[in-house]
């Protein structure tokens, strides 16, 4: 999602590019890392042991650890052939926002965990796609967590 939104100008121009190799710059990797810290904080608040994205990539792709996420992503050979979405209505943006970012942020809000970076991307995706992903997405309310205490929410995900 983040790559698609930040690279949305290239989507609009219909310029084809390597989604991960060109789409992720060092600065975009920093933004992804900031969002990932929020994801990990929400998971920890739920009592879920979550690996940071970099650690997950090292483990999943059997890579040597790198100093930063950008270098790590650039070292994943299987990412090299993946092309970008051709428009901002692509499932990488729409589905990842509704089913990934909205639940993370919404559950974070219910637990009192701030998610300002994730919130910003949900708002940007909503504006770019002309939709309200806060209403359409999988919110804590839609997941049956409305009015629950943090402990009750943790019990639901165990």
Language-model features and meaning:
Residues 1-7, 12:
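Single conserved hydrophobic/aromatic residue that forms the stacking wall/gate
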Residues 15, 29-158:
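NAD(P)-dependent Rossmann-like dehydrogenase/reductase catalytic/cofactor-binding core
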Residues 8, 24, 57-61:
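Glycine-rich beta-alpha junction loops
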Residues 14-15, 21-24:
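Long, compositionally biased stretches enriched for glycine and/or charged residues
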């Amino acid at each position: 999602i983040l790559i698609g939104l930040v690279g949305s100008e290239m989507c609009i121009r219909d310029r084809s590019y390597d989604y991960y190799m060109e789409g992720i710059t060092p600065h975009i990797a920093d933004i992804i890392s900031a969002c990932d810290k929020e994801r990990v904080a929400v998971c920890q608040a739920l009592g879920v042991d979550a690996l940071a994205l970099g650690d997950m990539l090292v483990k999943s792709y059997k890579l040597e650890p790198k100093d930063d996420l950008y270098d790590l992503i650039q070292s994943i050979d299987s990412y090299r052939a993946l092309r970008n979405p051709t428009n901002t209505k692509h499932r990488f943006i729409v589905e990842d926002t509704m089913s990934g970012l909205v639940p993370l942020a919404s559950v974070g809000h219910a637990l009192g965990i701030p998610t300002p970076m994730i919130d910003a991307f949900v708002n940007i995706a909503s504006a770019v796609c002309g939709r309200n992903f806060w209403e359409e997405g999988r919110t804590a309310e839609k997941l049956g967590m409305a009015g629950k205490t943090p402990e009750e929410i943790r019990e639901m995900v165990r």
